[in-house]
């Protein structure tokens, strides 16, 4: 491949005479750092506070009135029963999953609180909580805890593809966007 723009000797000499007396510039080696806020521990503290706030609603003594016949289900008073029907049919697919296998009741409450806080923060409407079968401790307690939380609109036993009777699909009330 040949050089398209080759210069003859006269043109090179003319160029060299035209640039005489100029100094070579040094490269500017200063790198500009972007102005950012330090993230620090604020998000970690906020996440911990959300988790504590969300688990505050879970009491072991309170026994809400849940239907004992048929699959595990609940709909908050004032919420649409049609939403519960859509949960049962599997019309909603969960975006977040929580597996409670192997956790103690205290750990399960904290993780459940963190899940509900994450759902509100990330604007997730449907989540799946897998409590498993085990000794039926978490299987019995999880619906009782969920029914106490004010952000839970409804829950229903999950369809087979999401865990069947070892899991619950949960609908979470999202914050209404402010018009300010």
From Swiss-Prot:
InterPro entries: Smr_dom, Smr_dom_sf, SmrB-like. The keyword Nuclease applies. The keyword rRNA-binding applies. Residues 98-173 form the Smr domain. One of its GO terms (molecular function) is RNA endonuclease activity. Keywords: Endonuclease, Hydrolase, Nuclease, RNA-binding, rRNA-binding. GO terms for biological process: rescue of stalled ribosome. It holds the Pfam family Smr. Its EC number is 3.1.-.-. SMART domains: SMR. Acts as a ribosome collision sensor. Detects stalled/collided disomes (pairs of ribosomes where the leading ribosome is stalled and a second ribosome has collided with it) and endonucleolytically cleaves mRNA at the 5' boundary of the stalled ribosome. Stalled/collided disomes form a new interface (primarily via the 30S subunits) that binds SmrB. Cleaved mRNA becomes available for tmRNA ligation, leading to ribosomal subunit dissociation and rescue of stalled ribosomes. NCBIfam families: PRK04946.1. PANTHER family: DNA ENDONUCLEASE SMRA-RELATED, UPF0115 PROTEIN YFCN. Associates with collided ribosomes, but not with correctly translating polysomes. Belongs to the SmrB family. This is Ribosome rescue factor SmrB.
């Amino acid at each position: 491949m040949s050089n398209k723009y080759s210069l003859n000797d006269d043109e090179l000499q003319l160029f060299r005479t035209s640039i005489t007396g100029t100094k070579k510039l040094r490269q500017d080696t200063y790198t500009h750092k972007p102005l950012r806020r330090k993230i620090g521990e604020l998000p970690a503290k906020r996440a911990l506070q959300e988790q504590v706030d969300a688990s505050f609603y879970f009491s072991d003594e309170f026994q809400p009135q849940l239907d004992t016949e048929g699959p595990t289900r609940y709909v908050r008073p004032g919420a649409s029963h049609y939403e519960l029907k859509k949960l049962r049919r599997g019309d909603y697919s969960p975006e977040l999953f929580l597996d409670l296998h192997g956790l103690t009741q205290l750990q399960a409450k904290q993780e459940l609180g963190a899940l509900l806080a994450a759902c509100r923060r990330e604007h997730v409407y449907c989540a799946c909580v897998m409590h498993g079968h085990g000794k039926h401790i978490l299987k019995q307690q999880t619906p009782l805890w969920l029914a106490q939380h004010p952000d839970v609109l409804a829950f229903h036993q999950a369809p087979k593809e999401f865990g069947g009777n070892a899991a619950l699909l949960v609908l979470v009330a999202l914050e209404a966007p402010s018009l300010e």
